Amino acid sequence: MRASLFLIPVTLGDTEHRRVLPEYNRDVILSIRHFIVENVRTARRFLKKVEPGIVIDDLTFYELNKHTSPEQVAGYLAPLAKGESVGVISEAGCPAIADPGADVVAIAQRKDYPVVPLVGPSSILMSVMGSGFNGQSFAFHGY
């Protein structure tokens, strides 16, 4: 498989990851050595929950926040050009949904890198599902 940008969902709250994330996500996580994250500390904690035996010091983390420039983000994608996949980890829920990960996806698409969203929880989708409203005309205006 060609190196890809994987969008890796994170649990919402204290939910046990095995209850909401498929085993496939774990397999993908274990195949990646480069992660673009909102917060390195919480991303490391999440990865340790998914696989306690993971060697965190063997991984590279790139921090993505409101101070990260587009040029820095483009640099974070450099492993893709070398044939190495990169994962995007948000603070909670799905990356790139009301999240700075969207900027990473846009740059990756412009560079013609494959983007692979993985299955996981989304607070926005869950709120629409539980609202009783028709999701056909749903519009999200931010948190």
What are these regions (language model features)?
Residues 4-8, 82-90, 138:
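Generic beta-sheet signal
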Residues 1-64:
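Glycine-rich, flexible N-terminal cofactor/catalytic loop recognition
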Residues 6, 99, 103-143:
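Class I SAM-dependent methyltransferase SAM-binding "motif I" and its flanking Rossmann-like core
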Residues 73-115:
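Glycine/small-residue-rich loop that forms an oxyanion/phosphate-binding "nest" at active or ligand-binding sites
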Residues 70-78, 124-128:
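Short, charged beta->alpha transition segments
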Residues 41-43, 93-94, 123:
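Alpha-helix capping/helix-boundary segments
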Residues 62-70, 143:
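Conserved helicase motor
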